[in-house]
Amino acid sequence: MILKLYNTRTRDFSELTNFENVKVYACGPTVYNYAHIGNFRTYVFGDLLIKTLRFLGYKVNYAMNITDIGHLTGDLDDGEDKVAKTAREKGLTVYEISEFFTEAFFNDCRKLNIVYPDKVLVASKHIPIMIEVVKILEEKKITYFSNGNVYFDTSCFKSYGEMAGIDLIDKDMTLPRVDVDKFKRNKTDFVLWFTNSKFKDQEMKWDSPWGFGYPSWHLECAAMNLEYFKDTLDIHLGGVDHIGVHHINEIAIAECFLDNKWCDVFVHGEFLIMDYNKMSKSRGNFITVKDLEDQNFSPLDFRYLCLTSHYRNQLKFSLDNLQASKIARENLINKLSYFYESLDPVDLNTLNKDLKNFGFSVEKEYYDSFVEKISFDLNVAQGLALLWEIIKSENLSFVSKLRLAFIFDEIMSLNLREEILKNLQNHDVVIDENMKALIEERRIAKCEKNFKRADEIRDFFAKKGFVLVDTKEGTKVKRG
């Protein structure tokens, strides 16, 4: 089935008809601190997109950048590089800071079951292409040099700001995250290459035709995209806060460089809201994955919370909401564990084979419904609701419910199979009346020293995948 996504660039839905080589780029972290769960809501959304594409049969080439050079705290040329600022505060080099927080970021991604990109583009390793892009734009007379910095002249790009609804004629409009800069020709102009900034002791600087300096955040992403994906990009991911400045600046750089349209589809995830504000490091109201773990939450509790809301809706975060997600996830695992422990060896064997080899039409109907939901703008929240409907259904066998749950989990990534097995190892198996009778017969046989019969009953349970454990409280049945 073809995936349809809401395209911020066209303000309409776009169908992805190319199945062969879908080029996807996500704006990664600026590695000057731990990423917070507001950031990770966006990365979970990106993960759901990549897994949905692959689930539907698309061949995906997925890249993410690491901004280790940092970007300015504001858009002014006298702002301070975030990575350099943290390095100075901690008495470390910028390389040590960026390496530490890059590793921390991907460790948290693993805990959240976020897929690792096919290519990680580290900004500091791609300086030559950034310089080359600026040189080409300079040759096209799209840049100007002012106060030691190279600026992009947005008046040269007639469609500048269209995605964000910015009107270049309105000179008095207030732009998000853009400060007044007296060295700009136009309010919307932005720096491509800095040689003059407030932080004079910055460690990351490179020689260029314009002097020793470093690239802007916007140039980094655009140039690395152009180098890795060449002349086209299919899908660009990011948060809604990227729309008004960063992504429209990327479009301007790339399309002026190519003299052609660059990226067809831009997809943006909404904020995670805490106390009626978006979560951000600058506001100081952020929570990390480790903070959740310290309060006895699993990172997968947060992932479950993310699954309950569509990516284009703001998601309110509170410990109460997270606790509700924790309880729901544990209930889901407990119900599936009950189904699983009730299976006979034949059904267990079936679950280890082709999951999509449906034996009943009702299974296929539920599967098709799930595919339909995720194919329309990643409606995973409806997919999760469908899973609960399946759990409660009286028209499906236990093996059918488990089969569908495991299929859905290829996208939801809640580790359902692993969590079930872990759950069963820690809990006694629920047994039926026939099993209870056999256990009682074995107890009597042992009392009568009829060890042959006792062993026969033990072996009978073993063939079904169970282990009998004799305790002071009686015989317990566990999975083998």
Curated annotation (Swiss-Prot):
A motif ('HIGH' region) lies at residues 29-39. It is an enzyme of class 6 (ligase). Its cofactor is Zn(2+). One of its GO terms (molecular function) is ATP binding. Disulfide bonds: none annotated. Belongs to the class-I aminoacyl-tRNA synthetase family. It comes from Borreliella burgdorferi (strain ZS7) (Borrelia burgdorferi). Its EC number is 6.1.1.16. It catalyses: tRNA(Cys) + L-cysteine + ATP = L-cysteinyl-tRNA(Cys) + AMP + diphosphate. It comes from the Bacteria. NCBIfam families: cysS, PRK14534.1. The keyword Aminoacyl-tRNA synthetase applies. Keywords: Aminoacyl-tRNA synthetase, ATP-binding, Cytoplasm, Ligase, Metal-binding, Nucleotide-binding, Protein biosynthesis, Zinc. A motif ('KMSKS' region) lies at residues 278-282. Gene3D superfamilies: Cysteine-tRNA ligase, C-terminal anti-codon recognition domain (1.20.120.1910), HUPs (3.40.50.620). GO terms for cellular component: cytosol. The keyword Zinc applies. This is Cysteine--tRNA ligase. It holds the Pfam family tRNA-synt_1e. GO terms for biological process: cysteinyl-tRNA aminoacylation. Monomer. It is found in: Cytoplasm.
